[in-house]
């Protein structure tokens, strides 16, 4: 599964093992992939002033323990996530309701986690 920036930030905010919650919902282990462009977005956030910078640094630490998906892509992250998901056949995991709606509109399978830690598998 391909993790987006909002999901990695949510891992920090929630303080919970949301990956295990997703595995319980799916009934099988998952293999999280973090695209290099998501890491780039987190690095940009970590370098800025404000409350998000600390969360972004912590999200980068979490992401460092996962497999990086090297794409060499640049540009608008959400659109690149759509392309990656369609090319690889992996769902995108997000807590961003706007992205979730866009993914569904584009025919991309996604796993949406809301703030109450409810997991929805959507196609």
Can you describe what each PLM-predicted range is?
Residues 1, 32, 111:
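Residues that recognize and position ribonucleotide moieties
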Residues 1-14:
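Metal-dependent nucleic-acid phosphoesterase active-site entry motif
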Residues 37-123:
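Nuclease catalytic cores that cleave nucleic-acid phosphodiester bonds
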Residues 21-47:
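PIN/NYN-family metal-dependent endoribonuclease catalytic core
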Residues 13, 23-27, 86, 104:
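Signal for well-folded cores of large energy- and translation-related assemblies
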Residues 15-19:
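Charged helix-capping and loop-helix junction motifs
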């Amino acid at each position: 599964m391909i993790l987006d920036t909002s999901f990695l930030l949510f891992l920090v905010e929630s303080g919970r093992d949301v990956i295990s919650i997703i595995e319980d919902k799916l009934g099988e282990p998952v293999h999280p992939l973090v695209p290099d462009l998501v890491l780039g977005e987190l690095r940009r956030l970590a370098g800025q002033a404000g409350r998000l910078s600390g969360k972004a640094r912590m999200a980068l630490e979490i992401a460092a323990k996962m497999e990086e998906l090297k794409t060499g892509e640049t540009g608008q992250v959400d659109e690149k996530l759509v392309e990656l998901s369609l090319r690889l056949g992996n769902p995108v995991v997000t807590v961003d309701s706007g992205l979730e709606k866009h993914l569904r509109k584009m025919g991309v399978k996604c796993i949406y986690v809301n703030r109450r830690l409810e997991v929805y598998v959507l196609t």
